[in-house]
Amino acid sequence: MGKETPAEKSLNLIRGRLCDPSYVFRPLSASSDSNYSKLKFIVSTSITEGCNNSMLLLGPRGSGKAAVLDLGVGDLLEQFPDSVSVIRLNGLLHSDDNCAFKEIAKQLCMEHHLLFSKMASFDDNSQFIIAMLRACGLAHKTIIFVLDEFDMFAQGKQRLLYSLLDAMQSVTSQAVVVGISSRLDADQLLEKRVRSRFSHRKFLFLPPSREELDGLFVHLLSLPADSGFPSGYVSRFNDKIKNLTSDTRFKDILKTLFNANSTVNSFLKFIFCAVSLMNLESGLLSLENFKAALSSMQRQPKLEAVRDCSVLELYLLVCMRRLEVKEQSSYNFISVMKEYKAIHDSFHTSDYYAQNVCLRAFEHLRERQVICYAENRGQSQTGEYRLQKLLISASELHQGMRSHACCPAILLKLLDH
């Protein structure tokens, strides 16, 4: 393999940054008022002062709850390497109490180099966990229980939550329970006996501000001056990034992106797409890269459905649209076939199919939810007599047909007139 060019090297560097949560969330966590700072302070207090704590991290998926927690726990593990033990559960995997207790016992055994018994009963595992909490407390070691998909644990009898929180009432225990959930009402799901033992400390993960986004954008994409890149290339690359942040067209792209999804995770995917489209000859990111990235992020299933239609199905869709233009808001297969025959008779098109073939294409459109029944009445009627309606707008149909690989030119003409 040949030597990497500066463009290839910068591409690999930025991709590595985007895949490293600690690098991504470090600048967002710099403020003393950030969730990272508050969370780290509470957990470090539990470690240094030997007290128990519980908290919830709430926010939409992709907002960085788990990443910020991992960042804080990672820093504490470096600061107190022999005083912290982390147990991780996921509600999608361990919502069953028996399974959850067994998993906790297994992770505790691995952490403390003990033998784990697969045959241990629920009571055995429960007693073992309580004994380990007591022993770790006496040894001034804090156990951090991370419960991802916390709302899944807040269903049923909630024995796991009750047992953990009840054991933390003991003077000798030293533990922190951190719940992570995308449900903002997760604490309201708790039973009264569990809620009374929970601290009700909640951290909300809100979308980043515009200033934070600009700072994150520069942080992720700027090249360091002392990284082995040619100095001229670094200055050109970084100047291009700064110019983009002040470009109104780029701001409009970001606005469109965040109207659909305002999470950090969505922003990272957007940047990753743009970086992957970078021209390796120039080695610089352009506005066009970000426009293309936005297009790839904006899934348009209706347009995709039109692009995947057969030519016959396109004819049927155009017929239905023409009937709507004629102020015929609802129609059945029979009236669509009359319009289809009228088009064939007027323009002598070669794409003319038998009625039974057209009916199968019509049913296929309904199966793909491009069209649907106009009303629930008339269920006793056969499919070709029931009223139908289009589920796509005229602009979506036109756009989908223009990007269709085999769309006959006559259909676009018929759609416009």
UniProtKB/Swiss-Prot annotation:
Main location: nucleus
Any Gene Ontology CC annotation: nuclear origin of replication recognition complex
One of the GO BP terms on file: DNA replication initiation
GO molecular function: ATP binding; ATP hydrolysis activity; DNA replication origin binding
Residues given in the record as ATP binding sites: 59-66
Gene induction: Regulated by E2F. Accumulates rapidly after cell cycle reactivation by sucrose addition following cell cycle arrest mediated by sucrose deprivation.
Highest rank taxon of the organism: Eukaryota
Pfam families: AAA, ORC4_C
UniProt entry keywords in alphabetical sequence: ATP-binding, DNA replication, DNA-binding, Nucleotide-binding, Nucleus
SUPFAM superfamilies reported in the protein's UniProt record: P-loop containing nucleoside triphosphate hydrolases
Tissue-specificity statement: Follow a cell-cycle regulation with a peak at the G1/S-phase. Isoform AtORC4a is expressed at low levels ubiquitously. Isoform AtORC4b is mostly expressed in siliques, flowers and flower buds, and, to a lower exent, in roots, leaves and stems.
Gene3D superfamilies per UniProt: P-loop containing nucleotide triphosphate hydrolases (3.40.50.300)
Localization: Nucleus
PANTHER family: ORIGIN RECOGNITION COMPLEX SUBUNIT 4 (PTHR12087:SF0)
Quaternary context: Component of the origin recognition complex (ORC) composed of at least ORC1 (ORC1A or ORC1B), ORC2, ORC3, ORC4, ORC5 and ORC6. ORC is regulated in a cell-cycle and development dependent manner. It is sequentially assembled at the exit from anaphase of mitosis and disassembled as cells enter S phase. Interacts directly with ORC1A, ORC2, ORC3, ORC5 and ORC6.
Function in brief: Component of the origin recognition complex (ORC) that binds origins of replication. DNA-binding is ATP-dependent. The specific DNA sequences that define origins of replication have not been identified yet. ORC is required to assemble the pre-replication complex necessary to initiate DNA replication.
Family: Belongs to the ORC4 family.
Protein name as catalogued: Origin of replication complex subunit 4
Organism: Arabidopsis thaliana
Gene: ORC4
